[in-house]
């Protein structure tokens, strides 16, 4: 009974792995290059399935026809060695099949790898365990980025985007299946990836290369806006963060940020207590417009949650839980040298810090303003 159960269990695992109704589905492309990949892979999968069935049938036939009929039957089955027609047939047919697959594969790879003119250039940095996006709006990658954000790649619809995928620590792999294939993020190398989204929407992805304890939690997310909304997003995200009024909880939270957070995080327009610019270590996400994002912490947790009326409400409790003890929510390196450590913030410091962070707008268009902002 057990020997019968194990093959069934293995088959069930394979069938479950093939379910394509998740958000990360390569068979429902929403981008030009992803559609080209799907156009290539479907006939290849069909051809592979047909070949697999033919091989299985032939193997079954040989096993049945060539078996020994009795225990004392010493005769060998009929041998085909030296049969010129048979050997030419089973050599040429696989060669033609490989040619049938290779030609469109090579042409598709060359097509999706070409960089269109006037594409928006964005540097994509992978690091344990989140993605950073740096926008070069002028197209000159040698100049400082105009916009630096994290966790959400915001792009306009029907526009060519040139991604320069890189890593600041170990090897990662950037993948948003609805828009294109995967591209490894390798330290010291710049890997190009071209995307173009056909529809306004939000598309999920993830790191596809094992990169440490929280690899499974290293999400990627693309937010595709209309061209008008994208221009508004650009103008808003080019601005520095506003300074909170003196004597407010937000101002007290800014002081906590400078004392506890500014060695890793950056907020444009914020100076350290000594008057020097906050360290641009890039070890942690740029928080200048945190409230404009719908997710945080490796895009793992929602920063905004829908209420019964369909409006978005600030997820203050989740953000406070994250600040209270990050390693309790996401696996980090045991020596706290990777990921966000537990800073041992007091509850009063957490309240003040969140009061400041919720001022880092703008907020999503259908969101209810946080009570403290």
Predicted regions and their residues:
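Alpha-helical transmembrane segments
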Residues: 41-67
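C-terminal motif of bacterial Sec signal peptides marking the signal peptidase cleavage site
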Residues: 15-18
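Non-transmembrane, membrane-proximal soluble domains of secreted or membrane proteins
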Residues: 20-43, 63-263, 268-282, 297-336, ...
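Helix-loop element at the rim of GNAT/NAT acetyltransferase active sites that forms part
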Residues: 359-364
């Amino acid at each position: 009974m057990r020997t019968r159960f194990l093959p069934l269990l293995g088959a069930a695992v394979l069938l479950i792995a093939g379910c394509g109704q998740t958000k990360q589905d390569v068979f429902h492309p929403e981008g030009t290059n992803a559609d080209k990949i799907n156009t290539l892979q479907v006939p290849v999968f069909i051809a592979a399935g047909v070949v697999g069935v033919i091989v299985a049938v032939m193997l079954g036939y040989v096993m049945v026809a060539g078996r020994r009929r009795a225990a004392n039957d010493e005769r060998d089955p009929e041998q085909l060695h030296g049969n010129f027609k048979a050997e030419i047939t089973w050599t040429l047919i696989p060669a033609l099949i490989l040619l049938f697959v290779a030609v469109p594969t090579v042409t598709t790879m060359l097509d999706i790898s070409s960089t269109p003119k006037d594409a928006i250039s964005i540097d994509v940095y992978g690091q344990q365990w989140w993605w950073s996006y740096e926008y070069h709006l002028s197209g000159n990658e040698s100049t400082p980025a105009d916009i630096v954000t994290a966790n959400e790649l915001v792009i306009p619809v029907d526009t060519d985007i040139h991604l320069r995928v890189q890593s600041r620590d170990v090897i990662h792999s950037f993948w948003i299946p609805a828009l294109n294939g995967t591209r490894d993020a390798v330290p010291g190398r710049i890997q190009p990836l071209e995307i173009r989204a056909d529809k306004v929407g939000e598309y999920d992805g993830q790191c596809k290369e094992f990169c440490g304890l929280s690899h499974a939690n290293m999400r990627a997310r693309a937010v595709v806006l209309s061209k008008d909304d994208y221009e508004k997003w650009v103008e808003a995200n080019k601005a520095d963060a506003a300074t909170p009024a003196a004597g407010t909880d937000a101002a007290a939270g800014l002081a906590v940020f400078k004392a506890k957070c500014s060695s890793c995080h950056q907020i444009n327009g914020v100076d350290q207590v000594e008057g020097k610019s906050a360290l641009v270590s890039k070890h942690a996400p740029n928080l200048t417009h945190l409230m404009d994002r719908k997710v945080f912490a490796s895009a793992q947790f929602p920063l905004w949650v829908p209420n019964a009326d369909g409006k978005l409400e600030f997820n203050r409790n989740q953000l406070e839980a994250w600040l209270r003890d990050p390693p309790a929510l996401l696996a980090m390196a045991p020596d706290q040298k990777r990921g966000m450590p537990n800073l041992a913030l007091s509850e009063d410091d957490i309240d003040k810090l969140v009061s400041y962070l919720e001022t880092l707008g703008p907020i999503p268009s259908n969101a209810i303003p946080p009570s403290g902002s």
